[in-house]
């Protein structure tokens, strides 16, 4: 009788454990791609944040007080500035860990270009921090808003307003960008058949650009449109 009771208890415990694991997996599978990307950013921040001092993280957060920027837009400055503080350290942490925007197919040449990014960052010296600029922001915001509504995917600013980018350089991307880290890393990797010259990467790693405007707005076909206007001058 005791053996029967013991066996029943073992079976019950195993069943409870199995159900708990199954429930956990169901909960994970129910997350949307946006939630998975947000969780990923939180996880890698927990994993790598101690590689930068509190003072370095404070310095990187140049857009913290820019009330006209969204949280995601502020994060773009933060991660780009962590890179600019110490490119090799960024290469060994965030750049090496990145796997693309979850729920979206990585562009052509993603793996090779990620490796070339890591190798390039390992050779770079610190750069001036990027700072927010309202004129550059409004130039970026106008194009992101109008371009997103019209379904634009490139640098063609033709249409109502926003014909001229006031900055010296511009980056444009469309996709499931719900975190600043995904914006920064996708543009740095610069995957895609039309990005063989790595134009976005070259702009973001150009030490002459110290001022930037960033806007992330809804896109008609591809969830979000990101526009970044950069300049060497404070406009």
Regions found by a protein language model. Name each.
Residues 64-165, 201, 207:
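Short, well-ordered surface patches within globular domains
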Residues 16-55, 63:
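Bacterial Sec-dependent N-terminal signal peptides
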Residues 47-59, 109-116:
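Short alpha-helical hairpin
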Residues 1-8:
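Bacterial N-terminal signal peptides that target proteins for export
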Residues 8-9, 90:
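A periodicity- and composition-biased signal for non-globular, repetitive helical segments
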Residues 9-17:
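Bacterial N-terminal signal peptides
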Residues 4, 20-24, 35, 131, ...:
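Intrinsically disordered, low-complexity peptide-like regions
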Residues 138, 142-234:
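A well-ordered secondary-structure block
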């Amino acid at each position: 009788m005791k053996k029967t009771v013991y066996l029943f208890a073992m079976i019950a415990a195993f069943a409870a454990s199995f159900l708990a694991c199954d429930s956990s997996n169901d909960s994970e599978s129910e997350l949307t791609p946006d939630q998975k990307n947000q969780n990923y950013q939180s996880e890698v921040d927990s994993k790598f944040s101690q590689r930068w001092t509190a003072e370095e993280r404070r310095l990187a957060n140049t857009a913290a007080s820019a009330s006209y920027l969204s949280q995601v837009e502020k994060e773009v400055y933060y991660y780009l500035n962590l890179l600019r503080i110490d490119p090799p350290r960024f290469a060994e942490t965030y750049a090496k860990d990145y796997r693309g925007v979850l729920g979206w197919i990585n562009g052509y040449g993603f793996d090779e270009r990620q490796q070339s990014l890591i190798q390039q960052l390992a050779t770079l010296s610190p750069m001036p921090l990027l700072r927010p600029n309202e004129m550059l922001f409004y130039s970026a915001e106008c194009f992101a808003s109008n371009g997103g509504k019209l379904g634009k995917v490139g640098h063609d600013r033709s249409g109502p307003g926003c014909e001229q980018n006031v900055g010296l350089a511009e980056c444009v991307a469309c996709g499931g960008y719900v975190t600043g880290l995904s914006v920064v890393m996708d543009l740095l990797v610069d995957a895609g058949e039309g990005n063989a010259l790595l134009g976005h990467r070259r702009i973001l790693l150009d030490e002459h650009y110290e001022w930037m405007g960033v806007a992330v707005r809804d896109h008609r076909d591809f969830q979000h449109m990101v526009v970044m206007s950069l300049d060497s001058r404070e406009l």
